[in-house]
Amino acid sequence: MKLSTSLLAIVAVASTFIGNALSATTVPGCFAECIDKAAVAVNCAAGDIDCLQASSQFATIVSECVATSDCTALSPGSASDADSINKTFNILSGLGFIDEADAFSAADVPEERDLTGLGRVLPVEKRQNCPTRRGLCVTSGLTACRNHCRSCHRGDVGCVRCSNAQCTGFLGTTCTCINPCPRC
């Protein structure tokens, strides 16, 4: 059975409910360990994308591991974290869930989001649109994601009402600003 987008979405769902609580576990190290454990469980090498895609259990095992290991925070700076980040992104890009160029780019990717329904009240031109940042949650953690969103709101139109942020997408790798800030 081919590894489908809906099956892999299970992993994404588990990683998006990270809330405000942070643990000492490193995100890339934790995710990489879960990927390794799941690969062994389905008799695949962690880098064998074709084998992982063919497995019907890989995403379920990774999802359960992410949930039970509390893969929600980053302790940045160690060489093993850098190796784990590379390994995790290689797996995710190999499975087609992230574009390697986007993941390793520092450039913002503009994306209009209306998660609060302000579009019904205020026209788009009256709202500030903050770009998502791919890979930021893994490389720098939820705190950096929140800082990115606050900086976006303050820098674009001088708005001081800080928006919240969350790590979304597959394995929570994308920083998404929520609660769009009306122009001040």
Swiss-Prot record:
<protein>
    <recommendedName>
        <fullName>Fungal defensin copsin</fullName>
    </recommendedName>
</protein>
<dbReference type="GO" id="GO:0016020">
    <property type="term" value="C:membrane"/>
</dbReference>
<feature type="disulfide bond">
    <location>
        <begin position="130"/>
        <end position="159"/>
    </location>
</feature>
<dbReference type="Pfam" id="PF18251">
    <property type="entry name" value="Defensin_5"/>
</dbReference>
<keyword id="KW-1052">Target cell membrane</keyword>
<keyword id="KW-0964">Secreted</keyword>
<feature type="disulfide bond">
    <location>
        <begin position="152"/>
        <end position="184"/>
    </location>
</feature>
<feature type="signal peptide">
    <location>
        <begin position="1"/>
        <end position="23"/>
    </location>
</feature>
<comment type="similarity">
    <text>Belongs to the invertebrate defensin family.</text>
</comment>
<keyword id="KW-0472">Membrane</keyword>
<dbReference type="GO" id="GO:0005576">
    <property type="term" value="C:extracellular region"/>
</dbReference>
<dbReference type="InterPro" id="IPR041284">
    <property type="entry name" value="Copsin"/>
</dbReference>
<feature type="disulfide bond">
    <location>
        <begin position="149"/>
        <end position="177"/>
    </location>
</feature>
<keyword id="KW-1053">Target membrane</keyword>
<feature type="disulfide bond">
    <location>
        <begin position="162"/>
        <end position="181"/>
    </location>
</feature>
<keyword id="KW-1015">Disulfide bond</keyword>
<comment type="function">
    <text>Antimicrobial peptide that acts against Gram-positive bacteria (Listeria spp., Enterococcus spp., B.subtilis, B.anthracis, P.aeruginosa). Is not active against Gram-negative bacteria. It selectively inhibits peptidoglycan biosynthesis through complex formation with the cell wall precursor lipid II (1:1 molar ratio), probably anchoring lipid II to the membrane, thus inhibiting cell wall synthesis. The interaction with lipid II involves the third position of the pentapeptide.</text>
</comment>
<keyword id="KW-0929">Antimicrobial</keyword>
<keyword id="KW-0165">Cleavage on pair of basic residues</keyword>
<keyword id="KW-0211">Defensin</keyword>
<feature type="disulfide bond">
    <location>
        <begin position="137"/>
        <end position="167"/>
    </location>
</feature>
<keyword id="KW-0732">Signal</keyword>
<feature type="propeptide">
    <location>
        <begin position="24"/>
        <end position="127"/>
    </location>
</feature>
<keyword id="KW-0044">Antibiotic</keyword>
<feature type="disulfide bond">
    <location>
        <begin position="145"/>
        <end position="175"/>
    </location>
</feature>
<dbReference type="GO" id="GO:0044218">
    <property type="term" value="C:other organism cell membrane"/>
</dbReference>
<dbReference type="GO" id="GO:0042742">
    <property type="term" value="P:defense response to bacterium"/>
</dbReference>
<keyword id="KW-0873">Pyrrolidone carboxylic acid</keyword>
<feature type="modified residue" description="Pyrrolidone carboxylic acid">
    <location>
        <position position="128"/>
    </location>
</feature>
<keyword id="KW-0446">Lipid-binding</keyword>
<dbReference type="GO" id="GO:0008289">
    <property type="term" value="F:lipid binding"/>
</dbReference>
